[in-house]
């Protein structure tokens, strides 16, 4: 938390957890929640941006003896992240899932905004205002999971831009992270969204390109992003490998930031 010379350092992670099931050649039959929790605890970030988090699922609770009694985000938070927020996006007969933010610091307020591009994909953005000791202004954190279609993503990025312009002061520190589903390398939509807001993608800063994060075993597609404002980037990493495939279809991304 405290860096060199008293600077404020923050560790963050973004992770699409695939509803708590691994990516396998066939249908996944065993949840990977225990392994996911161990993985996140080992990464030990201050803030975690999660996508495809199950808030409740009656069918899984009946079928799997080790299915947690609480929500997935509460189970993953355990004792490490005392503050958390959950945005319910997709609702079905058995339960619901969405995005979540886990935080070591107090979440002062939060809101989940429906940004679904059409009725076949339920998507949302989860916006939290967080009090981080040492920062002169509250941190704004936004977790997103965008559409599979380019047109849908473009509309959602515009909604995201509008929300940030309305609700986030221009001098406030800001992190936007999640699954942008932007698998086409020709796409300019994320860049066009970020530039007017003075947002910078952390892997583009450290490596020159967004991270390859999918599939987890041998990432090829650059689906996930971490955009920041008001921070310098100290370190970035993609946590991939065959063992990670047993946890989710995406690899987790982490970054170490220093407040400017």
Region locations from a protein language model:
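Residue-level detector of structured alpha->beta connecting loops
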Residues: 44, 81, 104-106, 198
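Active-site environment of divalent metal-dependent phosphoester hydrolases
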Residues: 19-22, 55-58, 92-95, 149-151, ...
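Short, solvent-exposed loop/turn elements at beta->coil junctions and helix N-caps
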Residues: 87-92, 116-117, 239-243
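Surface-exposed cleft-lining segments at the edges of enzyme active sites
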Residues: 20-27, 57-59, 112-116, 143-151
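N-terminal, active-site-proximal structural segment of metallo-dependent hydrolase catalytic domains
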Residues: 1-79, 84-86, 91-96, 259-260
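Beta-strand-turn-beta hairpins that frame and shape the catalytic cleft
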Residues: 3-12, 97, 103-109, 121-143, ...
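Metal-dependent phosphoester-hydrolase catalytic domains
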Residues: 112, 129, 161-174, 182-260
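Active-site beta-strand/loop signature of hydrolases that rely on acidic residues for catalysis
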Residues: 12-17, 36-64, 102, 128, ...
């Amino acid at each position: 938390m405290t860096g060199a010379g008293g600077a404020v350092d923050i560790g963050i992670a973004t992770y699409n957890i695939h509803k708590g099931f691994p990516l396998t050649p066939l249908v996944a039959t065993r949840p990977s929640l225990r392994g996911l929790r161990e993985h996140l605890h080992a990464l030990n970030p201050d803030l975690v941006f999660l996508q495809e988090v199950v808030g409740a699922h009656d069918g899984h609770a009946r079928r799997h003896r080790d299915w947690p009694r609480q929500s997935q985000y509460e189970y993953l938070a355990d004792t490490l992240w005392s503050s958390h927020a959950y945005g319910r996006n997709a609702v079905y007969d058995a339960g619901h899932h969405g995005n979540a933010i886990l935080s070591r610091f107090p979440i002062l307020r939060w809101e989940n905004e429906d940004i679904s591009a059409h009725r076949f994909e339920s998507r949302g953005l989860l916006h939290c205002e967080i009090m981080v000791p040492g920062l002169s202004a509250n941190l704004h954190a936004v977790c997103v999971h965008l559409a599979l279609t380019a047109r849908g993503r473009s509309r959602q990025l515009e909604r995201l831009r509008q929300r940030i312009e309305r609700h986030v002061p221009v001098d406030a520190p800001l992190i936007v992270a999640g699954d942008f589903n932007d698998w086409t390398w020709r796409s300019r939509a994320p860049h066009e969204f970020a530039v007017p807001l003075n947002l910078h993608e952390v892997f583009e800063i450290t490596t020159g390109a967004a991270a390859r994060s999918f599939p987890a075993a041998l990432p090829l597609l650059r689906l996930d992003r971490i955009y920041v404002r008001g921070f310098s980037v100290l370190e970035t990493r993609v946590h991939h490998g065959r063992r990670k495939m047993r946890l989710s279809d995406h690899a987790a991304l982490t970054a170490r930031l220093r407040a400017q």
